[in-house]
Amino acid sequence: MKRTLLLFFTLIVATMSFEDIAERIASSLEMTREEVQTCFHKTNATLDLMQIDEISEDRLQTMDFDNSAVKIGCFFACLGQKKGVMTGARVNVDYIKQFISSHKKARPNQLTRAFKILDTCADQVRSKTNECEVSLKYILCFIYKMERTYRSNNIDE
């Protein structure tokens, strides 16, 4: 199922223009398309570099990212700084929690789990000083831990 969804989204991205992608990112983050395009241009990130799913969880804490991954990390850092989610190489977890609370209609136990994961991932990148590395590792940490939580909840049900 996961591979089917990945293939589906890859095909969608392949058929979408740069402007379409920038517009969707801007809309989901409540930013302007110009702000997103500025981050694309500033970091030299391209759509074909958006393969963060290829970075395995066990390599997340130990690896030195290749140039492509660094560009994507810098792109995420740029977006995060424009949105107020990051200041330099520091993640503003309280802002993220507030943003999630005000925009998502989740059950309290789901929010509690998500907030705990946000805190755990922030602790994992706290000692890092490179904003590109921080943003990429933080996002990947959150994705991996949320997926693991979701899988374990589905198994339990």
Question: Each predicted region: which residue ranges?
Answer:
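Mature extracellular/luminal domains of secreted and GPI-anchored eukaryotic proteins, especially small
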Residues: 13-157
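Cleavable N-terminal signal peptides of Sec/SRP-targeted secreted and luminal proteins
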Residues: 2-17
